[in-house]
A protein has these predicted regions:
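Intrinsically disordered, low-complexity segments enriched in small/polar residues
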Residues: 1-3, 53, 129
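Bacterial Sec-dependent N-terminal signal peptides
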Residues: 1-8, 13-44
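Polar low-complexity intrinsically disordered regions enriched in Ser/Thr and small residues
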Residues: 6-8, 71, 76, 116, ...
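Generic detector of short alpha-helix boundary/capping microenvironments
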Residues: 11-13, 84-85, 119, 135
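Extracellular secreted precursors and ectodomains with disulfide-bonded cysteine-rich loops/domains
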Residues: 22, 94, 116-119
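N-terminal pre-ligand scaffold of iron-sulfur
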Residues: 27-111, 126-127, 143-159
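Short cysteine/histidine-rich metal-coordination sites, predominantly Zn2+-binding motifs
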Residues: 110-121, 132-145
Length: 159
């Protein structure tokens, strides 16, 4: 017998299957290969003092405050950590996705204020909008890493 309860069950089953299948797919725009990223930033450390103000950023790499290879990003180009709101941080790989897709070149973007620019292809990426390209040939955003904030510490990871 088919009643309202069985139609709802079928609908819920379809929704669950669709969600589980879509969550397994790699993001189409994530063209930079995965590397291990896992580090903490202490906002009381003078090296990261700029992150105490909304709209500021810091560049993190292997040598930053002895964070090591887990703060290197792809091909040791480093990671941009940007404070977008009081309790929200955005972490982006500095590798230009356009140059990587084109020929496998690994070029670190330069950061000035709220924009990052590739010195090779001249694509510009907006930090407040999660590294979305705003000009130039790039069709891909900068690779983004997960962040969490606990009041004093910002955790950046791809786990």
């Amino acid at each position: 017998m088919s009643g309202p309860g069985s139609k709802l069950s079928i609908f819920l089953l379809i929704c669950i299957v669709s969600l589980s299948l879509s969550s397994c797919k790699k993001q189409k725009n994530d063209v930079i290969p995965d590397v291990t990223v896992d580090f903490y930033i202490d906002l009381t450390d003078p090296e990261f003092f700029d992150l105490n103000a909304i709209g500021n950023h810091v560049l993190v790499n292997y040598n930053t405050n002895n964070l090591g290879y887990k703060a290197s990003g792809y091909d040791n180009n480093g990671i941009i950590v940007y404070r977008s709101q009081t309790d929200e941080f955005i972490a982006l790989d500095r590798t230009c996705p356009h140059d990587y897709v084109l020929d496998g070149t690994s070029i670190a973007v330069n950061v000035d204020g709220v924009y990052a620019e590739c010195p090779l292809c001249k694509s510009t990426y907006a930090l407040p909008s999660f590294g979305t390209p705003t000009s130039g040939p790039s069709k891909y955003p900068l690779k983004m890493y997960r962040t969490s904030f606990t009041g004093q510490f910002v955790h950046v990871t791809n786990y």
